[in-house]
């Protein structure tokens, strides 16, 4: 070993010690997770929920678009029909052990029934506990879009209501008037 190599090695050791002392007194970037929550942006894609209309009914019309667009096939549902002609899901099931939280189901939903909330604490030791049914997903409020009502904007007539007496709702669109 030459004197030059010894001096370079000594200076490298001094530089390493100075870097350690510099970082000892700087603020730590690590968050103490359970006690100190992380900031999540408003567009964070977390747990999937099902929302309700303004009147308290289910928004989901069982169109099956969410299940079709899901890349990992974690959504399953079965359509049923009410007496007034509206569709609703007889069962709605999401397997969160397969879900990749891509948000495609939220984008595909025409009724804004499916929404992603900023909940990310879904871990469990048993995989069967990560299969959520409709009762687990359905919340009591309208979620992110409180004023949105699918049937008001789509102009679909409900069997029990007369077209003349739609209170505060748009009349149904006559599709034949739209033809060229």
Curated annotation (Swiss-Prot):
Entries under InterPro entries matching the protein: 4Fe4S_Fe-S-bd, 4Fe4S_Fe_S_CS, NADH_quinone_OxRdtase_chainI
Entry keyword annotation includes Transmembrane helix: no
Main location: membrane
Record's bilayer topology term: Peripheral membrane protein
Cofactor note text: Binds 2 [4Fe-4S] clusters per subunit.
Residue ranges of coiled coil: none
Enzyme nomenclature, EC number: 7.1.1.-
Cofactor: [4Fe-4S] cluster
Chain residues that bind [4Fe-4S] cluster 2: 70, 99, 102, 105
GO biological process: aerobic respiration
Catalytic reaction equation(s): a quinone + NADH + 5 H(+)(in) = a quinol + NAD(+) + 4 H(+)(out)
Domain of life of the organism encoding this protein: Bacteria
GO cellular component: plasma membrane
Binding-site list for [4Fe-4S] cluster 1: 60, 63, 66, 109
Keywords: 4Fe-4S, Cell membrane, Iron, Iron-sulfur, Membrane, Metal-binding, NAD, Quinone, Repeat, Translocase, Ubiquinone
Example of a GO MF term: NADH:ubiquinone reductase (non-electrogenic) activity
Localization terms from the record: Cell membrane
Domain 4Fe-4S ferredoxin-type: 50-80, 90-119
Function: NDH-1 shuttles electrons from NADH, via FMN and iron-sulfur (Fe-S) centers, to quinones in the respiratory chain. The immediate electron acceptor for the enzyme in this species is believed to be ubiquinone. Couples the redox reaction to proton translocation (for every two electrons transferred, four hydrogen ions are translocated across the cytoplasmic membrane), and thus conserves the redox energy in a proton gradient.
Family per similarity comment: Belongs to the complex I 23 kDa subunit family.
Quaternary structure note: NDH-1 is composed of 13 different subunits. Subunits NuoA, H, J, K, L, M, N constitute the membrane sector of the complex.
Name of this protein: NADH-quinone oxidoreductase subunit I
Taxonomic placement: Bacteria, Pseudomonadati, Pseudomonadota, Gammaproteobacteria, Enterobacterales
């Amino acid at each position: 070993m030459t004197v030059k190599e010894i001096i370079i090695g000594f200076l490298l050791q001094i530089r390493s010690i100075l870097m350690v002392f510099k970082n000892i007194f700087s603020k730590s970037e690590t968050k103490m997770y359970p006690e100190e929550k992380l900031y999540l942006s408003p567009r964070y894609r977390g747990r999937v929920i099902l929302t309700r209309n303004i009147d308290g009914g289910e928004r989901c019309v069982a169109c099956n678009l969410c299940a079709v667009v899901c890349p990992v096939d974690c959504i399953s549902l079965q359509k049923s029909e009410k007496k007034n002609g509206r569709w609703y899901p007889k069962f709605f099931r999401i397997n969160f052990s397969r879900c990749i939280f891509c948000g495609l189901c939220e984008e595909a939903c025409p009724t804004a029934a499916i929404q992603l909330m900023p909940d990310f604490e879904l871990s469990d030791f048993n995989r069967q506990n990560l299969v959520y049914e409709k009762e687990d997903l359905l919340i009591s409020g309208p979620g992110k879009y409180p004023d949105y009502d699918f049937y008001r904007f789509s102009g679909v007539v409900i069997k029990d209501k007369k077209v003349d007496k739609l209170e505060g709702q748009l009349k149904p669109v006559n599709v034949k008037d739209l033809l060229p």
